Design a protein with these regions (language model features):
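Charged, terminal alpha-helix-loop-beta segments
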Residues: 1-266
Length: 266
């Protein structure tokens, strides 16, 4: 089995040529093009197409050294379709992130400060995704290995339309839903692209995800080998930590004050 460092070294040699060719100037032009789409209130499908051809706009969410590809148009059975998805690795082990792209012309809140119909619909859809994963756990894990409690991202509306009162309501809403939903305006991608361009060094970008995202068919064919290695190593580490926790708990129980065994206890 490869180690994390070995997987990173191998990934570094696999940077997509389209990513290697990126320059700060090209990224500025890409960001301007995406901003024009937002300003023209382009259809969701147009935004999805652009993002599917410019994976680095997700660089603020996906670890730069992540081995997981970014997938688009992932179908959850015959019921739902997720705009984008990837497998995320953190201290708690691997878990999936699911993304819903909504209309840039939609408001986040009504004039009375309540979640708009567009935001309410998007949040319900995210909850439906999570419910589907739980109700079809075996099937879901065949498609997306390790999926259990996915975190759903919603991108909707524009930052300029968010009032101070809306901002406070959004903070509360995000806190209340933090275990299952994260909400951003579509301008989040603009900022992510800008930061990516500013971070391009003399050796070029270090973004290891293909420029053009993968598809449902790719996902059905299984995770790439390096991702499977990361999953296996993460599971091994978690099992080792779990065994250590169990041993510590047993030691604590066996050595609790007043509970030491005597010869007559044996």
């Amino acid at each position: 089995m490869k180690t994390f460092s070995a997987a990173n070294a191998e990934n570094a040699r696999k940077i997509d040529p389209l990513i290697r060719e990126l320059t700060s100037k090209k990224v500025v032009a890409d960001v301007a093009e995406f901003t024009r789409l937002l300003d023209s209130k382009a259809r969701e499908s147009k935004l999805q197409e652009f993002l599917a051809s410019h994976s680095y706009f997700f660089s603020g969410m996906i670890d730069v050294y992540s081995p997981s590809p970014l997938y688009a148009k992932v179908k959850l059975g015959h019921d739902y379709e997720v705009d984008f998805a990837w497998l995320y690795f953190d201290s708690f082990g691997p878990e999936w992130r699911l993304v819903e792209i909504e209309n840039p012309g939609s408001a986040l809140f009504t004039k009375s400060g309540e979640p708009s119909s567009a935001l309410s619909h998007a949040m319900q859809q995210a909850r439906d995704w999570c419910a589907w994963v739980h109700d079809h756990a075996e099937y879901a894990r065949k498609l997306m290995p390790q999926i259990s409690h996915p975190l759903c991202y919603i991108f909707l509306g524009r930052r300029k339309d968010v009032t101070p009162a809306n901002r406070e309501a959004l903070r509360k809403l995000r806190y209340d839903r933090r275990s299952e939903i994260v909400i951003h305006t579509l301008d989040w991608f603009v900022r992510s692209g800008q930061v990516f361009g500013q971070c391009i060094g003399p050796d070029g970008p270090t973004w290891q995800i293909p420029m053009k995202v993968l598809t449902q068919r790719d996902l059905k064919n299984g995770l790439p080998e390096e991702v499977q290695d990361w999953v296996a190593e993460a599971q091994s580490k978690m099992m080792t930590e779990r065994r250590l926790d169990q041993r510590r708990a047993k030691w604590s129980r066996d050595n609790e004050p007043g509970m030491f065994k005597t010869d007559t206890d044996i």
